[in-house]
Amino acid sequence: MPSSSAVLCCLVFLAGVAASRDASTLSDSSCTHFPASLPHMLRDVRAAFGKVKTFFQMKDQLNSMLLTQSLLDDFKGYLGCQALSEMIQFYLEEVMPQAENHGPDIKEHVNSLGEKLKTLRLRLRRCHRFLPCENKSKAVEQVKRVFNMLQERGVYKAMSEFDIFINYIESYMTTKM
């Protein structure tokens, strides 16, 4: 679960933007520049993941993949928007809170990674053409089912494959630009 101070900060920010007379101009402007800023945002997410990647990949002792080709196919297909939205929510609400329980250093880095993912989600939501959806993805449901079956090992598996998730985000976004 996101910390209450982070949620409060986001709500105050969003209220300020909504109250602004130029809110739609700001949103349109940021959406115009979003495709150009996406590589930088993904680079930041990758760098944040790099700080915990080795830890989680060393702990992941499973030979199977959690993030499968069917998920990438959903990202590239008509369910891409929903698959992306659900996977961001899955990592923020299910994976990362459990991943933070592996010591203060890991918690700090996972928290930073989560904040960068939240920022990306916020930008995607502001630019409706990138995230205008509500249908459920069967591939995401499969990822969640396997994650839950793996119990504690699911955290290691999901976090060790976070770089694959970043690549899937990039693949989805390139189809939308």
Swiss-Prot record:
Subcellular location as annotated: Secreted
N-terminal signal peptide: 1-19
Keyword match Protease: no
Glycan-carrying positions: 135
Disulfide bridge map: 31-127, 81-133
A GO CC annotation given for this chain: extracellular space
Pfam families, alphabetized: IL10
GO MF annotation: an example: cytokine activity
Tagged with keyword Secreted: yes
Entry keyword set: Cytokine, Disulfide bond, Glycoprotein, Secreted, Signal
SMART domains listed in its UniProt record: IL10
GO terms of biological process kind: immune response; negative regulation of B cell proliferation; negative regulation of cytokine production involved in immune response; negative regulation of inflammatory response; negative regulation of interferon-alpha production; negative regulation of interleukin-6 production; negative regulation of membrane protein ectodomain proteolysis; positive regulation of B cell apoptotic process
SUPFAM superfamilies: 4-helical cytokines
PROSITE patterns in alphabetical order: INTERLEUKIN_10
Complexes and interactors: Homodimer. Interacts with IL10RA and IL10RB.
Family in the record: Belongs to the IL-10 family.
Function in brief: Major immune regulatory cytokine that acts on many cells of the immune system where it has profound anti-inflammatory functions, limiting excessive tissue disruption caused by inflammation. Mechanistically, IL10 binds to its heterotetrameric receptor comprising IL10RA and IL10RB leading to JAK1 and STAT2-mediated phosphorylation of STAT3. In turn, STAT3 translocates to the nucleus where it drives expression of anti-inflammatory mediators.
Protein name in the entry: Interleukin-10
Upper lineage: Eukaryota, Metazoa, Chordata, Craniata, Vertebrata
Gene name linked to the record: IL10
